[in-house]
């Protein structure tokens, strides 16, 4: 596992972004883990978070002209990612985000930031049903820009109603690569080597066997 991935998992555990137990999902499934991106709520969190997103983007090799953050959670993530890309990788990208309600005074419009054009990387926390992604892609295409890819913190690697995960469905629908800082598979591999987390490892591994779409046998 790459260093930044392990460090991100440690960061999530330390800030209790990632917790273990029994959590009922909207689908009715009982998940052994819970990811709460809303707890990235301190200045120090955002600085670290931006670095992890930036590392994942650079590692992916995806090229883009602009970062787009869907309101609301995608906004701070996109801004801190843009800052980290410049500070740590000397990559100075424009960013942009949408408003939930279109403003009809001042600068007006439904977007804030740079002009939405060129190759756009969509940045968000996670993909569940894919509704926010669909709305964002519609905005991107409405401005004659192209979707370069999608960057999220966590790929749950979990089947929906069919055989594909939410991310695989998005990739198939929009013919664009979805990259993540970590995956469920990464978390399982990390926990496997943590003697104090044997119970969590066992629960995640069992859940992955039942609902997962992992790329290889764990």
Curated annotation (Swiss-Prot):
State the Gene Ontology terms under molecular function: magnesium ion binding; orotate phosphoribosyltransferase activity
Enzyme class per UniProt: transferase
Q: Which domain of life is it from?
A: Bacteria
Annotated InterPro entries: OPRT, Or_phspho_trans_dom, PRibTrfase_dom, PRTase-like
According to UniProt, the reaction catalysed is: orotidine 5'-phosphate + diphosphate = orotate + 5-phospho-alpha-D-ribose 1-diphosphate
Its EC number is 2.4.2.10
For the keyword Transcription regulation, the answer is no
HAMAP family per the record?
PyrE
What protein is this chain from? Answer: Orotate phosphoribosyltransferase
Organism equals: Hamiltonella defensa subsp. Acyrthosiphon pisum (strain 5AT)
Lineage of origin = Bacteria, Pseudomonadati, Pseudomonadota, Gammaproteobacteria, Enterobacterales
Name of the coding gene: pyrE
């Amino acid at each position: 596992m790459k260093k930044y991935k392990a460090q991100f998992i440690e960061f999530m555990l330390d800030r209790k972004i990632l917790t273990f137990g029994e959590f009922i999902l909207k689908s009715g499934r009982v998940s052994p883990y819970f990811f709460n991106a809303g707890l990235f709520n301190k200045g120090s969190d955002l600085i670290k978070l931006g670095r992890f997103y930036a590392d994942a983007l650079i590692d992916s090799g995806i090229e883009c002209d602009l970062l787009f953050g869907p309101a609301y959670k995608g906004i701070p993530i996109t801004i801190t990612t843009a800052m980290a890309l410049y500070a740590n990788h000397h990559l100075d990208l424009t960013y942009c985000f949408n408003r939930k309600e279109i403003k009809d005074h001042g600068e007006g419009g439904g977007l804030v930031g740079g002009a939405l054009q060129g190759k756009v990387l969509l940045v968000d926390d996670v993909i569940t049903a894919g509704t926010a992604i669909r709305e964002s892609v519609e905005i991107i295409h409405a401005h004659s820009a192209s979707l370069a890819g999608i960057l999220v913190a966590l790929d749950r690697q979990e089947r929906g109603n069919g055989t594909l995960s939410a991310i695989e469905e998005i990739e198939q629908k929009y013919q664009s690569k979805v990259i993540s800082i970590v995956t469920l598979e990464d978390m399982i591999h990390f926990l496997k080597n943590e003697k104090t987390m044997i119970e969590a490892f066992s629960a995640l591994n069992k859940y992955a066997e039942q609902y997962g779409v992992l790329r290889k046998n764990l």
